[in-house]
Amino acid sequence: VAAEQDRLRRADIVVLQFPLFWFNIPSLLQRWMEEVWTHGFSHGTGGDALKGKKLLLSLTTGAPAQFFTPEGADAPDFTPLMQGLINAAGFTGMEFVGIESTGGVSYSLRTEAEQLAAIEAKADEHAQRLIDRISAL
């Protein structure tokens, strides 16, 4: 826990990268937050270690992006699903700077070489968009 907290202290930008799992963050990420973002570290008396840091969410989904795109919109909107993390950012004094997402990268699609190549290309594109967003912060 101390090593994770030290990494967070040294960071200006915190990127939480995860697959969307049943419309939420994975349980291991939730557990990590519960164990690392502790009273006295991230919040509460003396708990200002995350204050002023930028929080960027980077997520992937197995379902295609259009599944998460509201009618009439051009892009998916994960804000309602990520409201808990957005609230956690505010509670800890972090600045929430957005969500980078890529859909259609399910493990179940990795059965043929063409499908795997398409998923790898999506992953590369996601990584580049993430780099661009971080560079702009």
Task: Place the predicted regions along the sequence by residue.
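Glycine-rich phosphate/pyrophosphate-binding loop and the adjoining helix
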Residues: 75, 82-137
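Helix-loop-strand module that forms the ligand-binding subsite of alpha/beta enzymes
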Residues: 2-86
